[in-house]
């Protein structure tokens, strides 16, 4: 099980992205930075609010760190729990990785999509090719290796029980967080996530330029 509790410390900028935190602060370098603008999917990781909800694939390069405080984050570094996840094994078997830079993002997107509780419904090995195309629509392979990646997706779907079991991720906490007040960090830039309308109004009044 891949689970760790991290505190967002004073060295973490208030405007840091999830990707910056994962690679620099947490040392989890499996998640890659490709475009830094949310277009290529190389930085895809999975986020969920609690263990009773399905993971959602997000682009870590454009996700503010403050937005995922208290959420579980699963990266490619912990996907296999000591071995290869079925999606990773299938990518190897079907030669779905060429230069390899985009591979972690594709793996994470497919792992999330194989979840039977996914909001868009379950995909299986008999799902049509277009459904699988949509599953990786947010990921770009510059080597144009889409056919073997799609083959790997369908192969992974055959390992139903294993492919649909995702481990727990790391939980990101914050220094300034309580049940009564929203999350707030300060530096040259700031981040504030109010938990009530009153908090929002107070923050807006204090920073009308925001």
Ranges and model annotations:
Residues 1-204:
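Signature of N-terminal electron-transfer/Fe-S-associated modules in redox systems
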Residues 207-210:
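Short, intrinsically disordered, charge-balanced linker/junction segments flanking boundaries
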């Amino acid at each position: 099980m891949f689970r760790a509790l991290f505190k967002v410390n004073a060295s973490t900028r208030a405007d840091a992205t999830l990707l910056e935190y994962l690679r620099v602060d947490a040392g989890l370098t499996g998640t890659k930075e490709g475009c830094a603008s949310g277009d290529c999917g190389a930085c895809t990781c999975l986020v969920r609010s609690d263990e009773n909800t399905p993971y959602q694939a997000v682009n870590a390069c454009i996700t503010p760190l403050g937005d995922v405080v208290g959420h579980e984050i699963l990266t490619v570094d912990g996907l296999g729990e000591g071995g290869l996840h079925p999606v990773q094994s299938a990518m190897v078997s079907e030669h779905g990785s060429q230069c390899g830079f985009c591979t972690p993002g594709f793996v994470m997107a497919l792992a999330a999509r194989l979840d039977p509780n996914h909001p868009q419904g379950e995909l299986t090995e008999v799902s049509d090719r277009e459904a699988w195309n949509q599953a990786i629509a947010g990921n770009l392979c510059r080597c144009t290796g889409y056919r073997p990646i799609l083959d790997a997706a369908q192969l992974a779907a055959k390992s139903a029980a294993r492919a649909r079991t995702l481990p727990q991720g790391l939980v990101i906490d914050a220094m300034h967080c309580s049940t009564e007040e929203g999350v707030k960090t300060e530096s040259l830039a700031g981040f504030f996530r109010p938990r009530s309308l009153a908090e929002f109004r107070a923050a807006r009044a204090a920073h009308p330029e925001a």
